[in-house]
From Swiss-Prot:
Gene3D superfamilies registered for this protein in UniProt: 3.30.1390.10, Single helix bin
Alphabetized InterPro entries for the sequence: Ribosomal_bL12, Ribosomal_bL12_C, Ribosomal_bL12_C/ClpS-like, Ribosomal_bL12_oligo, Ribosomal_bL12_oligo_N_sf
Gene designation: rplL
UniProt source species: Liberibacter africanus
GO annotation, cellular component aspect: cytoplasm; ribonucleoprotein complex; ribosome
Protein name, per record: Large ribosomal subunit protein bL12
Length: 125
């Protein structure tokens, strides 16, 4: 019996719990993820795969900010959210936090650009 066949035989005899443990250990050992890649299939109507997979709503997430530019970030958050000065300050200081949800891609990118120019660290989700 070859090495490959004996490995297949041993793996086939594992219980579900043992297989899950093996998967975790291999992920840690090799630094990879066992998550399956997501494949997008074009529909019969002829839609392109890019159009099907494109996200339409985004969340602007305040990850943090440059301490030297805190005042600029507070001003920008205040302008975007229409919060009062104290509320905007508290919001910025409580980062990481979601700033705005359900916005279009263009609006999210514009907000990100403004906030990063002010000194914030922004993630679009």
């Amino acid at each position: 019996m070859s090495n490959i066949e004996s490995i297949v035989e041993k793996l086939s005899s594992l219980t579900l719990l043992q297989a899950a443990e093996l998967s975790k250990r291999l992920e840690e050992e090799w630094g990879v993820s066992a998550a399956a890649p997501v494949a997008v299939v074009a529909s019969a109507a002829g839609e392109s795969a890019a159009a099907v997979a494109e996200k339409t709503e985004f969340e602007v997430f305040l990850e943090g900010f440059d301490a030297k530019k805190k005042i600029s970030v507070i001003k920008e958050v205040r302008a975007i959210t229409e919060l009062g000065l104290k509320e905007a300050k508290d919001f910025v200081e409580s980062a990481p936090k979601s700033l705005k949800t359900g916005v279009s891609k263009d609006e999210a990118e514009e907000l990100k650009k403004k906030l990063e120019a002010a000194g914030a660290t922004i993630i679009l989700r």
